[in-house]
Amino acid sequence: ISFGACSANNAAAETEASQQTPEATSTPDVTVELDTSEDKGAGKSNAGSMSVDEQRYASVLDLYYQALYAHQAGTADWDRDKYVVERGLAECIVNPYWAWENSDGLLSRIGYSFRDLNGDGTNELLLGWIGGDFCPMEDGYAFAVYIINGQPLLAFQGQERDRFLIGDDGYVYRSGSSGAAYSEYEKYRFHPEWQYCLEPVELFYSQIDEDNHFWWEHVVGAEQIMGLQRLERHEEYVVDSDFAMETGKIWTSSGVNLRPSNFLVYAAKRG
């Protein structure tokens, strides 16, 4: 499975990558292969009970199942680096913060679903958390999104403080924070020709200067967002703080229920 799915057809993409917030997670450029050394309960194809999308993404779903199985069991097979660094899996899926001390039920609390994010007739694979009060898939949150381009490819992934939500209006929204004074809300179109498959549409972000003056800025348009120098104050972009935060609240409340299946269900289908 290769990672590094989406690219930009313009030079500004590199500018965007260099100006991400500290929490933003880039896509690792590595190649990994399915570990078939041990039977972890999934991997033997039972295609008759699997959907077309589950068959299409089976290679990456198998890898996530293996990682989650090992983590939940607490076996010697569980090694964060083995799955996150060597195989390039999304850390918030195989190693969520709420499982650090108690991984019981991990296979039932991590889920996946399929959704056509750009209307091209092919569904993407979305992975995230099931249930709970913090960023569940039922509220539209996804911590990893894969596309198909001959094989499954990781488009983008989130973190606990850099979260992606699939809006009911077809947009992808990101909410991020690197402290009380630095927050962002960003609106994207899902577009495979852009870096991380995300075309910037609209951005709200907060800043604070050395004199503790705090403000929000609002930027519209991919060219303007990607060329932005975020450590500077731009008077033309400054907006009312209440307006910025209220808009961010509306965006992050617009998630569509992704109706996830968990990995126990996946294992049963795989046989």
Tell what function each PLM region has.
Residues 4-5:
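C-terminal motif of bacterial Sec signal peptides marking the signal peptidase cleavage site
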Residues 131-135, 179-180:
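Short glycine/acidic-enriched loop and turn motifs that connect beta-strands
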Residues 154-159, 198-202:
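Beta-propeller fold detector
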